[in-house]
Design a protein with these regions (language model features):
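N-terminal organellar transit peptides
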Residues: 1-60, 65-168
């Protein structure tokens, strides 16, 4: 599969099968991560995500939608305030700032579906840019557990290898 949506809802998947995704990503667009979050949440089967390497920035957002979220012991999890590049006049800068504020609130809403720390604490961690090892991410409720490094890459029901690795 070329995309998460295709993995979950493509012709080779029964759209009810349990899915296990091994994730390694430095992130990307807030909007794309929100779409992936929504796709995972709407999926009728169980979705397990194992962070193997790094889940950073927008990649942490889609992780929040998993039914089960684990990290391997050597993996890292990073949250930070959203950022952008803006060009234009004062009004354009105000608009860019408003979009960033709204994006942060949206991310905090999605974090709030899982984390065991307060929204204010999560916002403070984002403002500071916070890197967490697997144990700290577990303690703060970002992940459900720390797991051993898988010996084999998981496969879906059609036998496809399932790995989202954008950190190449």
């Amino acid at each position: 599969p070329d995309s998460l949506h295709e993995l979950l809802y493509g012709k080779d998947n029964a759209a009810t099968d349990d899915v296990h995704i091994r994730l390694n990503s430095y992130g990307g667009s807030c909007n794309a991560a929100t779409r992936m979050f929504d796709d995972i949440r709407a999926y009728p089967g169980s979705v397990k995500i194992t962070v193997s390497g790094t889940a950073a920035s927008a990649a942490t957002v889609l992780c929040m939608a998993a039914d089960r979220l684990e990290m391997t012991p050597g993996s890292l999890f990073m949250i930070h305030d959203p950022s952008t590049v803006a060009y234009g006049n004062e009004r354009d800068m105000d608009e860019a700032k408003a979009v960033l504020r709204a994006c942060k609130e949206s991310i905090l809403n999605m974090y709030g579906t899982r984390i065991r720390i307060s929204r204010d604490d999560a916002a403070d961690m984002m403002m500071k840019t916070s890197w967490m090892d697997a144990n700290e991410a577990f303690e703060k409720g970002f992940v459900d557990g720390v797991t051993e490094t898988p010996a084999k890459l998981p496969t879906d029901s059609a036998g496809h290898k399932v790995s989202l690795d954008t950190a190449k």
